[in-house]
Amino acid sequence: MGSLVLTLCALFCLAAYLVSGSPIMNLEQSPLEEDMSLFGDVFSEQDGVDFNTLLQSMKDEFLKTLNLSDIPTQDSAKVDPPEYMLELYNKFATDRTSMPSANIIRSFKNEDLFSQPVSFNGLRKYPLLFNVSIPHHEEVIMAELRLYTLVQRDRMIYDGVDRKITIFEVLESKGDNEGERNMLVLVSGEIYGTNSEWETFDVTDAIRRWQKSGSSTHQLEVHIESKHDEAEDASSGRLEIDTSAQNKHNPLLIVFSDDQSSDKERKEELNEMISHEQLPELDNLGLDSFSSGPGEEALLQMRSNIIYDSTARIRRNAKGNYCKRTPLYIDFKEIGWDSWIIAPPGYEAYECRGVCNYPLAEHLTPTKHAIIQALVHLKNSQKASKACCVPTKLEPISILYLDKGVVTYKFKYEGMAVSECGCR
C-alpha cells in the first residue's frame, strides 16, 4: 500500500515550492513534463524516488479512501445536491462538537421520473425507483426514506389532513406468476399534515437486505389513504407526495454507513509516517549497535565525537529555517476536481517545511533514528541524508462529493490536514 502521508507531504512541498504558498497552480497551464527540471532539488536526497510515481500514489490513495476506482466523470451540467445533504455538510462543518451517526452518508434520488400517481377509492399510489449500491465491507447503520408531503386544505375550515402512509417494496415475481406483483410492507405510519414538509420513514432493514442481495435496482410504492376508510374528499383537503424532478423535493433514500476503517487508517498513517526511516543507506554504516544493546550510550558517544562540527550549523539553524508547519491552501478548482467535489471548494492543508539539522529541537519530537541519521549526515553527508521534516500528526476533513451520480458525504477523510510537524 502506498504511503498516503508521504505522498501528500511530497505533493504539498512541491506545490509550495512552485507557488510559494499560493493556491495550487493550474496543471493545464503548466504541464508536468515541462516542470520536471525544477523538482530535482526537492527530491535530491531521496534516491530512487520518482515524482510521477508519488503523484499517482497520492491520487490512488485519495480515491481508494473514497471507494473510487478513478476520478468520476460527471456531466458538464452542474449537479444540484439535495438541500438535506448541503445542510448536513454545513452543520458538521460549522459545529465541531457534533458528529453524525455514521462516517459515510449517501443520498439516492428517485429514478422513476415518468410514472404518475394512481388514485382509486380514496387510495393514492406513488411508484418510486432507486438504484442503491453499498459496498459489502460497509456496515449500514441506518437508512431512511424522505418524502415531501404536499398538504392542500381549506385553512378556514380544517386544521389539518389526517392520512395513513404505507411504504411497500415491489418484489420480483417468480415461477408462473410473472404477471402478479408481490408487495412487502416496509413501514407504515399516520400523518396529520398541517403544512407541506418532509416526512421520514425508517427502512434500515430493507437496505441491509438489499446490500446482501447484490441487486442494485429496487422499486417501492407509497400508498396514501384516509385513516377512517372513507373516500378522500377534495373539499376536506388533500395530502400528496411531491415526486417532481424539477424541484428540490424529489424523494430521497438516505443511507448511513460506516466503513469501520477509521481506527485502521489512523494506525496505518502512523506506520506510514515512519516507514521512510528504513533507509537502505544506513544498512552499510555499521550502526546496528544503535538499534540494540546500549543505544543511549552509543548515541552519546557519537555525539561527543562529532559535536565539534555542529557549532556553525547551529548558527545557520537559528535563522528560522527549521522544520515547522506552514500554510498551504488546496483549491479543488485549480486541480480540476471541483466537477465532482461539491464541498468544500478548498481547504487549508498546511505543509511541513524546513530543515532537520543537528541538534534536533525537542518540540520536533525526533525519534532516536532521526537523531542518529542527523549525526551521521553531519559527519558524512554522502553516507546518509538529513532527517526529513514531515507531518507527525494529521487531522481529517469533511467532504461532500459525487460518486457515480450519488451525492455522498464523508465526515472524516483522514490524513488531509497537517496539525504538527517533526523530524523523522
Curated annotation (Swiss-Prot):
Which tissue types show expression of this protein? Answer: Detected in mammary epithelia (at protein level).
| Cleavable signal peptide | 1-21
Q: Where in the cell is it found?
A: Secreted
GO BP terms in the entry: activin receptor signaling pathway; adult heart development; atrial cardiac muscle tissue morphogenesis; BMP signaling pathway; cardiac muscle cell proliferation; cell adhesion; heart trabecula formation; kidney development
The keyword Transport appears for this protein: no
Q: List the disulfide bonds.
A: 323-389, 352-421, 356-423
Question: Propeptide residues, per UniProt?
Answer: 22-316
This protein's superkingdom?
A: Eukaryota
Specify the inducers: Down-regulated in some breast cancer subtypes and breast cancer cell lines.
GO MF term set: cytokine activity; growth factor activity; hormone activity; receptor serine/threonine kinase binding; telethonin binding
What Pfam families is this protein classified in?
A: TGF_beta, TGFb_propeptide
Ordered alphabetically, the record's keywords are: Cell adhesion, Cleavage on pair of basic residues, Cytokine, Developmental protein, Disease variant, Disulfide bond, Glycoprotein, Growth factor, Secreted, Signal
Gene Ontology cellular component terms for the protein in this record: cell surface; cytoplasm; extracellular region; extracellular space; Z disc
How does the annotation summarize its subunit structure? Homodimer; disulfide-linked. Interacts with FBN1 (via N-terminal domain) and FBN2. Interacts with ENG.
Similarity annotation: Belongs to the TGF-beta family.
Noted disease association is:
Defects in BMP10 may be a cause of congenital heart defects, a wide spectrum of cardiovascular malformations resulting from anomalous development of the heart, cardiac valves, and endo-thoracic large vessels.
- Its recorded name reads Bone morphogenetic protein 10
